[in-house]
Every structure is written in structure tokens, then in C-alpha cells.
């Protein structure tokens, strides 16, 4: 399980994981939005070790600011954050008519309901299995159809 109190993502090298599909040259980042600095660092390290480009934000406001600079392939979104929570982020995201799959990630039992409330593509419960995380990302991320 990938959890904040576990070792760094690079220490998970011995685990059997589902490979991320790199047959498509997609360099658009995965945007991870979470107020827990350890989770951000761990997810960034792990996803980068899987060949993905990652950007991080500590709250919804930072994430919205980043969206002026990058077009993510997928957003991993925590719901309970200071400054601007997941609900506020989703509302402002939609107001800007942005389109990108959003995967809610939360430890709350209400994950499914919250994902439905904000119109998220999917949800994943914390702590999550690395295989489940990679499969969710691969299943829902937008592929860049432009050649490099």
C-alpha cells in the first residue's frame, strides 16, 4: 500500500507493478493536488520513477494557477485542503471550461459520493495500492495525439 508513513516511492522498486503505457509519446503531466507535503513528494517520486511527468500543488488555488502554464493529462485531487478545497477547485475548473480527467483521492468513506458531486472521472481511496493507482492513471489519463 502507498501511504504517507511508508518509505519513499523509490523503495517500492521490488513490488510487482502494472507498467504505464509509454507507446504513446505523452509528456503532459499528471497534476497531483494534496495539502500533505509527504504525500505530494511520495507520489511525485513514485510516478516519476514510472516515467510520468508530474506537477504538484498544495491546494486548489495553486492547482488553478498551474493550469495557466500546463495542460495535464490527469488530475489527482484530494478533497480536504486549506485555501481552496476539492469542491472549490472543481467548481472553478469547470467555470474556466477546462477539460481534463479528475480522479478524487481521499481517505474519507465518502470518496465515491464526493467524486460524483464534483463530476470526477473516478476516485481512489487512500491508502492505495500502487497497482491500483497506476491502473487508474492509465485508464483515465488523456493521451497526447500530437507527434513529438
Regions found by a protein language model. Name each.
Residues 1-29, 131-148:
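Non-catalytic signal-transmission and effector/linker regions of two-component phosphorelay proteins
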Residues 58-62, 84-88:
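Acidic catalytic/metal-coordinating carboxylates
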Residues 88, 108-124, 131-135:
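Alpha4 helix (beta4-alpha4-beta5 surface) of REC/receiver domains from two-component response regulators
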Residues 81:
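Receiver (REC) domain active-site loop signature in two-component systems and cognate sites
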Residues 78:
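Active-site residues of response regulator receiver
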Residues 41-49:
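Charged docking surfaces used in two-component/phosphorelay signaling
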Residues 65, 87-98:
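Short amphipathic alpha-helix used as the core "switch/output" element in two-component signaling
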Residues 103-105:
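Hydrophobic/aromatic residues positioned on beta-strands within the core alpha/beta folds
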Amino acid at each position: 500500500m502507498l501511504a504517507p508513513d511508508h518509505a519513499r516511492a523509490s523503495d517500492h522498486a521490488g513490488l510487482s507493478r502494472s507498467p504505464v503505457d509509454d507507446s504513446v509519446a505523452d509528456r503532459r503531466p499528471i497534476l497531483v493536488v494534496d495539502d500533505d507535503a509527504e504525500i505530494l513528494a511520495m507520489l511525485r517520486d513514485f510516478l516519476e520513477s514510472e516515467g510520468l511527468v508530474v506537477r504538484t500543488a498544495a491546494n486548489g488555488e495553486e492547482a488553478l494557477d498551474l493550469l495557466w502554464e500546463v495542460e495535464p493529462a490527469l488530475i489527482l485531487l484530494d478533497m480536504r485542503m486549506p485555501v481552496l478545497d476539492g469542491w472549490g477547485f472543481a467548481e472553478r475548473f469547470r467555470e474556466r471550461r477546462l477539460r481534463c480527467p479528475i480522479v478524487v483521492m481521499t481517505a474519507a468513506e465518502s470518496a465515491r459520493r464526493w467524486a460524483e458531486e464534483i463530476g470526477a472521472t473516478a476516485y481512489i481511496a487512500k491508502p492505495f495500492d500502487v497497482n491500483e493507482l497506476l491502473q487508474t492513471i492509465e485508464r483515465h489519463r488523456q493521451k497526447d495525439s500530437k507527434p513529438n
